[in-house]
Amino acid sequence: MKTFDDLFAELSEKAATRPEGSGTVRELDAGVHSIGKKIVEEAAEVWMAAEHESDEAFAEEASQLIYHLQVMMLAKGLTLADVYRHL
């Protein structure tokens, strides 16, 4: 099972090595505005899943939101420590 830290390490590696065909690289190249729109979309899907779908569907949507938040962190040049300071 992948953890929050594992995911960030994986995404950081993709951002650094830029493998061909990577969705993460494509999203980073699209920029902060595009990533932000995706975060808003995913947040709405999390909410709707919480209200109207199974716990499994909610967990899947939450994982997608976490992914896009971490991509935004990379796009902004932030680390996990930058965010953890505010928890």
Swiss-Prot record:
A GO BP entry = L-histidine biosynthetic process
- Enzyme class (EC, first level): hydrolase
Q: Where located?
A: Cytoplasm
Q: What catalytic reaction does the record list?
A: 1-(5-phospho-beta-D-ribosyl)-ATP + H2O = 1-(5-phospho-beta-D-ribosyl)-5'-AMP + diphosphate + H(+)
Biochemical pathway: Amino-acid biosynthesis; L-histidine biosynthesis; L-histidine from 5-phospho-alpha-D-ribose 1-diphosphate: step 2/9
GO MF, one example: ATP binding
Q: What is its main location?
A: cytoplasm
Gene Ontology CC annotations of this record: cytoplasm
Q: Which family does it belong to?
A: Belongs to the PRA-PH family.
Instruction: Tell me the protein's name.
Output: Phosphoribosyl-ATP pyrophosphatase
Which source organism does the UniProt entry give? Answer: Leifsonia xyli subsp. xyli (strain CTCB07)
